[in-house]
């Protein structure tokens, strides 16, 4: 994934070096759809999915948009990921797991939905390339589904989640992002973007907040009237 991202970014940057005239055709609306890669290192969690957004170009340099993404992946919860209260509950059980030769890890599946809206600031001094930056602020909906791999872990999950194997949470995330678009034509382009965000979900189980990095690669379609001339 990283190699593909670097190759696409290098292609866009090389294109930028040959395109230094200002854009003269900027459509009023944009629709973007992309493959999404979401990494949360503190949980050793990698998720993949899709991202889509709608944008309104109020000015060549200013876009207002709404973004939605869905990502899914799996990993395992380890004791050091948990907050002190939850670790205290586990303390009497860990020696028993060790005697039985059972690793103290809970496999799980995770789904992450994000909803985001706000401004984007564009640099359009190159004819076929747009650089942009934006604040990241929105709502994150996380769904955790435990996948116990033996009866002992299943009982442990039931105890921690009050008889359930799944849990969900809604939290606010914040951060920043940016990227580059290769404007192949006034109505079609390729975009690479990345966002860095911070949030604190499942705080009654997990310790501290989380940082995640999202990378998206996809196509952008532009339509509506040409807004060049607005300042």
Language-model features, listed with the residues they occupy:
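Gram-negative (and chloroplast) outer-membrane scaffold detector with strong preference
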Residues: 56-155, 220-222
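Extracellular loop and loop/strand-boundary signature of outer-membrane beta-barrel proteins
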Residues: 37-41, 101-107, 158-166, 201-207
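Residues that define the transmembrane beta-barrel architecture of outer-membrane proteins
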Residues: 27, 46-50, 74, 109-115, ...
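Short glycine/proline- and aromatic-enriched beta-strand/turn motifs that initiate or cap beta-hairpins
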Residues: 21-58, 64, 70, 214-231
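Bacterial N-terminal signal peptides
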Residues: 7-16
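Sequence/structural signature of outer-membrane beta-barrel proteins
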Residues: 36-42, 73-75, 126, 140-144, ...
């Amino acid at each position: 994934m990283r190699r593909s991202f670097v190759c696409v970014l290098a292609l866009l940057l090389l294109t930028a070096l040959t395109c230094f005239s200002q854009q003269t055709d900027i459509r009023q609306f944009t629709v973007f759809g992309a493959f999404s890669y979401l990494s949360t290192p503190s949980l050793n969690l990698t998720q993949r999915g899709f991202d889509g957004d709608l944008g309104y170009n109020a000015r060549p340099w200013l876009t207002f948009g709404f973004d939605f993404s869905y990502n899914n992946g799996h990993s395992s919860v380890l004791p050091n990921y948990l907050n002190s209260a939850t670790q205290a509950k586990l303390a009497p059980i860990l020696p028993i797991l060790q005697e039985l030769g059972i690793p103290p890890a809970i496999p799980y599946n995770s789904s992450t939905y994000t909803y985001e809206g706000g401004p984007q600031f564009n640099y359009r001094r190159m004819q076929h390339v747009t650089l942009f930056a934006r604040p990241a602020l929105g709502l994150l909906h996380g769904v955790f589904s435990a996948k116990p791999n033996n009866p002992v872990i299943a009982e442990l999950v039931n105890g921690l989640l009050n008889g359930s194997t799944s849990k969900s949470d809604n939290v606010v995330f914040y951060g920043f992002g940016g990227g580059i678009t290769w404007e192949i034509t006034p109505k079609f382009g390729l975009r690479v973007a990345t966002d860095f965000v911070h949030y604190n979900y499942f705080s009654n189980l997990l310790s501290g907040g989380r940082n995640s990095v999202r990378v998206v690669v996809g196509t952008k379609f532009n339509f509506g009237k040409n807004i060049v001339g607005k300042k």
